Amino acid sequence: MKKDSYSWWTKRISAMAKLYDIVRIDHFRGFDSFYAIPAKDDTAKNGVWKDGPGMDLFNVLEKKLGKLPIIVEDLGFLTPSVKKLLKDSGFPGMKVIQFAFDSREDSDYLPHNYPQHCVVYTGTHDNDTVMGWMKTAPKDCVRFAKDYLNLTKEEGYNWGMMRAAWSSVADMAIVPMQDLLGLDSKARINIPSTTGGNWQWRATPEQIDNKLAKKLHKCCLLYTSDAADEL
């Protein structure tokens, strides 16, 4: 791809920028290094790690397309070189609140550890919904989440977790529609490493009414910098 100045990537990102306000690039660590498996092999045992394009690609994209509204998925185990690439790129990484409560150890996903330059999610397409997670996660994890976030049935567990996202220092918060609607695991988008039944959920017009819109609007205003003037 470098030989043609990353033509495919340039066209792809350019097209996405026309369709969406923000583009998210998943599997960011692959731009630092990736595991290459021979196409003819049936298993991954003969694969080898290879260097990714690194900043060379992102420098070319910026030169051709200018500054782009990009979020990068930097979840999971990150090597020092991946962290350096993220810093050098200037793109915001992701924080998923659900990931914060897997253990009692201090986690980078706990809101008090967020840097400002990041994007916080209650969950992604690969997570259960908040309400589903509250029912299926280990009891100690749920208890930790309730204590840390002061989650209550009265407020709604989903609204409590959204409150945590909005009130964090993260530059941006993104909430899946299923969490906004308070839906359970039946509305989950995807279960990784499974086939069938994924990517089928759709919101309907009947689920989104003025009452919900007004509540969301108030919450968004509450956590803006000029909230006092708006409320």
List each language-model region with its residue ranges.
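C-terminal accessory segments of extracellular proteins
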Residues: 216-222
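A short acidic/small-residue loop/turn micro-motif
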Residues: 209-210
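Conserved small/polar residues in nucleotide/adenosyl-binding loops
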Residues: 223-231
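Alpha-amylase-like alpha-glycosidases and glucanotransferases acting on alpha-linked glucans and related
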Residues: 1-174, 178-185, 191-206
